[in-house]
Amino acid sequence: MDELELRIRKAEKLVQDAKKEFEMGLYERCCSTAYYAMFHAAKAMLLGYGRDSKTHRGTIYLIWECREELGLSDDDCSKLSRAFDLREESDYGIYKEVSKDLAIKILKDAEIFVQKAKNAVNKNR
């Protein structure tokens, strides 16, 4: 199994983990895990096109830069950027709590993003 497949599998597992965290009422944790699912999916897509970055911000930048060839819309890229910002707030912030509504939105965004990544990786093979 190559790195692309491993990253897609990891992304799918993280989506399932985020669902469990949501069901347990762990909304901040859910958002963080959902972001990491999107991150691994993004890395898989980029690797499929011979691109990579060592940082989260760099990965997001490359996703924006390569969005057309990856078959992503501006909205798809915005969801990844939003999830990254929320993950930072969830992990490090102390002033905001993540609501149930926001957590379910980020979780759904992650499910869609991971599926699009899976489709892009399969198309590129």
Swiss-Prot record:
It comes from the Archaea. Gene3D superfamilies: Nucleotidyltransferases domain 2 (1.20.120.330). InterPro entries: HEPN_dom, UPF0332_toxin. Belongs to the UPF0332 family. This is UPF0332 protein AF_0298.
